[in-house]
């Protein structure tokens, strides 16, 4: 977790750092108030998946039912066992001299049935009270994400989770429970983490829970429609965010003195050439990833390119929904990992609709034999450090210069290595 306000981005100039000597790189190189932190999510870290009254999430179901969809066939039953070992983890963070810990609350741990009417799990509430108190006692601030992909299985069973309009009200009620229980100590709230990731991976490719996509794609999904469901899931995530943010701002913000935002992820897209068709393709790449959410959050509507290309498959906001969405965040959490070349892709006549092809771009890591950058350990992660600066400037110039927290970034490696390979990133 890194904090930065884009007002000052224009003044940034890369330092001529020698990677053989990092002795001059320290906190004094950063502006006062810059926040250094680390981040996690409930399903990936907590474990205790079926302990102390917690209900199952769609990820519990997905990893147990389809272990072949997980690279090493693992699940979140134990994870790193933070549920039982959070004091050790926070002690390590303190030793690292961190300022903040960003973690998510497991919706089904506090509401096992997903709804207030299904009962509140006090043991879950107690766990997060203890976690928050431990973070504060060790001199750090909690940055709390309300939703990091773990929809309660009960809501998936009842109305297919984020494909159902009812989730907007249920998420608002869940958020209010968290504001009531933890808002006296939590001053930074994040409603959703990477709604693009949920929409695409869970409903277009079927690689995330609940594993939906069009049958004709032959991706071994549980059913779905890759041309419609990703847009619907994104739409309801946006409305859920707006409902929770509005509630916080009108009912809790004045007394609790906190702020609320949303975390989005985006690649950077470099035009494959100087041709207008490729320049436009790069812009569409940003529209279909970042603008898909930032346009509604700042302008109350989807990007023009999406409205033109997706047409009737793209849901519409009512006048009231548009009003609630516009400006519904105090800060933007931004996650950046990778960049792509973007070139124009031809429209295929009579093609079956799928979000994967709607943007009419061909995104690659190499163009005409020239790689954009070296690859990290993940097949989707191209190491292109300048992409984060370009992305920050793009957000500043196109979306009203919001306050930004860099809530995730970095690269992975298939081997244990020294810090030197990460410094350029």
From Swiss-Prot:
It catalyses: Hydrolysis of terminal, non-reducing beta-D-glucosyl residues with release of beta-D-glucose. Residues 1-11 form the signal peptide. One of its GO terms (biological process) is carbohydrate metabolic process. PROSITE patterns: GLYCOSYL_HYDROL_F1_1, GLYCOSYL_HYDROL_F1_2. Keywords: Disulfide bond, Glycoprotein, Glycosidase, Hydrolase, Signal. Homodimer. This is Cyanogenic beta-glucosidase.
